[in-house]
Design a protein with these regions (language model features):
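Short, extreme N-terminal segment that most often corresponds to the first beta-strand
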Residues: 1-24
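A general secondary-structure signal for short beta-strands and their flanking turns/coil
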Residues: 1-4, 45-49, 92-94
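Beta-strand secondary-structure signal
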Residues: 4-6, 51-53, 98
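Short secondary-structure junctions
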Residues: 28-36, 90-96
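Residues that cap or initiate secondary-structure elements
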Residues: 11-16, 58-60, 105
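Extended Gly/Ser/Thr-rich low-complexity repeat segments
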Residues: 21-25, 60-85, 95
Length: 105
């Protein structure tokens, strides 16, 4: 499943480094490459918004690698659980961003 996720942050220059480092680590753990695409950031009212496409191969590999943690995450739908897991995973790596699932297919 491909996820379209909106990233929100008030400090993108700092968070971008942490975010990309964390996702690159996830790619290595899941034995995938080029698993996500970041669009150009847009700034409004002190916030920066970035649309991300999380490709199916990285998503499915993460679902397998972290199945128990995702299952325990908050949310009633699988998409919510996955997004909440990813937020917590990023927070544990000092990346303080917000994620909003825009679409999944």
């Amino acid at each position: 499943m491909t996820y379209y996720i909106q990233i929100s942050t008030i400090d993108w220059p700092k968070d971008q480094v942490l975010f990309e480092d964390t996702l690159n680590t996830l790619e290595k753990l899941c034995d995938t490459q080029n698993g996500y695409i970041l669009n150009e950031p847009v700034s409004k009212f002190g916030w920066t918004f970035i649309d991300m496409i999380l490709k199916a191969d990285l998503h499915m590999s993460m679902e397998q690698e972290f199945a128990e943690q995702i299952k325990k995450s908050k949310g009633s739908k699988p998409e919510e659980k996955f997004t909440n897991f990813l937020v917590k995973y990023l927070e544990n790596n000092n990346c303080k961003i917000k994620l909003k699932l825009m679409q999944s297919n």
